[in-house]
């Protein structure tokens, strides 16, 4: 009995290829997916509904006293930043093995890691979908640049932690400029794109980003309110090289106690209290306060140099500094 070879035309037939859905079928599948929107967004919406200070939105409003962009574009930028900020928190909490966020269980402990990662990634693209409303294709370029910057900074931070490598202060500042500064810069660059004012606030925003992060690092180890919201000394449990920890380790390289505690990822309160005393003994908390004061002075100097091009700048920068938890200095 003879057998015939397969017909190559049949094997290559378009019938065997996946065809795009058309007409009613496409609408049906779209409708089904739309019905899952709340489920897909659930980890994100849970985080969004937790009480927060909404600092970034308030800062955008404060800077708009100078940039005066139209209200509709201002709301678009606020939405973009809100989506990105909360998406990054979802990912941060997973990468840091966090347990609490704003005093309640983190999203991935409720919805699971896979669903939470998907919700965070979904939010990145919801934010990107807002960009055409700004009416300038350069918005996509800014968005991509700053998201790449944010992920570079996050990668540096994670590497130091996982490799138990204590960075220098200069490396820390570079990381913060990318990670924390990225979202601040994204907001201000999109605002400048939408404004007819000729002001460059990026240098100021870079300084504010560093102030914000050092303050956060300080409060993580010294604030009762922070303990309630995120747990006591969470940075120690994460093994994170925060600003006071970096200063303390580098102030006394022969003392390996603090670096050893970081490697343990301890949840023991007594061990963490001992670590805080080690940090205090090297004057590292005072160093934080001194560095913040120095950076606040630098921010004020940047405003001063802008001169008359930014009317009312002194009062506005006080409001911005106040928003990130610093009392305005008396002049």
From Swiss-Prot:
Keywords: Magnesium, Metal-binding, Transferase. Pathway: Secondary metabolite biosynthesis; terpenoid biosynthesis. Its cofactor is Mg(2+). Binds 3 Mg(2+) ions per subunit. Mg(2+) 3 binds at residue 216. Mg(2+) 1 binds at residues 92, 96. It is an enzyme of class 2 (transferase). Gene3D superfamilies: Farnesyl Diphosphate Synthase (1.10.600.10). It holds the Pfam family polyprenyl_synt. PROSITE patterns: POLYPRENYL_SYNTHASE_1 (PS00723), POLYPRENYL_SYNTHASE_2 (PS00444). It comes from the Eukaryota. Belongs to the FPP/GGPP synthase family. Geranylgeranyl pyrophosphate synthase; part of the gene cluster that mediates the biosynthesis of the diterpenoid pyrones subglutinols A and B. The first step of the pathway is the synthesis of the alpha-pyrone moiety by the polyketide synthase dpmaA via condensation of one acetyl-CoA starter unit with 3 malonyl-CoA units and 2 methylations. The alpha-pyrone is then combined with geranylgeranyl pyrophosphate (GGPP) formed by the GGPP synthase dpmaD through the action of the prenyltransferase dpmaC to yield a linear alpha-pyrone diterpenoid. This is Geranylgeranyl pyrophosphate synthase dpmaD. The gene is dpmaD.
């Amino acid at each position: 009995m003879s057998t015939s070879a397969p017909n190559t035309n049949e094997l290559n037939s378009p019938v065997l290829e996946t065809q795009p859905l058309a007409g009613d079928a496409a609408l049906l599948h779209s409708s089904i997916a739309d019905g899952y929107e709340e489920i897909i967004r659930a980890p994100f919406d849970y985080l969004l509904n937790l009480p927060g200070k909404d600092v970034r939105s308030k800062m955008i409003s404060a800077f708009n006293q100078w940039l005066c962009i139209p209200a509709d574009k201002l709301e678009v930028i606020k939405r973009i930043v809100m989506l990105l900020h909360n998406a990054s928190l979802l990912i941060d909490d997973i990468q840091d093995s966090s347990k609490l966020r704003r005093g309640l269980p983190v999203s991935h402990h409720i919805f699971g890691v896979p669903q939470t990662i998907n919700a965070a990634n979904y939010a990145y693209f919801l934010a990107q979908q807002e960009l055409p409303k700004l009416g300038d294709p350069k918005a996509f370029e800014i968005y991509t640049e700053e998201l790449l910057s944010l992920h570079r900074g996050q990668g540096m931070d994670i590497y130091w932690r996982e490799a138990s490598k204590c960075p220098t202060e200069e490396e820390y500042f570079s990381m913060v400029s990318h990670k924390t500064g990225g979202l601040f810069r994204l907001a201000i660059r999109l605002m400048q794109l939408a404004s007819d004012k000729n002001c460059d606030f990026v240098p100021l925003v870079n300084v504010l980003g560093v102030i914000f992060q050092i303050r956060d690092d300080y409060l993580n180890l010294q604030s009762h309110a922070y303990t309630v919201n995120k747990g006591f000394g969470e940075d120690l449990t994460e093994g994170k090289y925060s600003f006071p920890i970096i200063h303390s380790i580098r102030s006394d390289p022969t003392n390996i106690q603090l670096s050893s505690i970081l490697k343990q990822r301890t949840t023991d309160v007594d061990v963490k209290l001992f670590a805080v005393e080690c940090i205090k003994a090297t004057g590292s908390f005072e160093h934080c306060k001194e560095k913040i004061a120095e950076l606040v002075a630098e921010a004020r100097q940047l405003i001063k140099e802008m001169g008359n091009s930014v009317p009312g700048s002194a009062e506005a920068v006080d409001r911005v500094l106040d928003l990130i938890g610093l009392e305005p200095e008396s002049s």
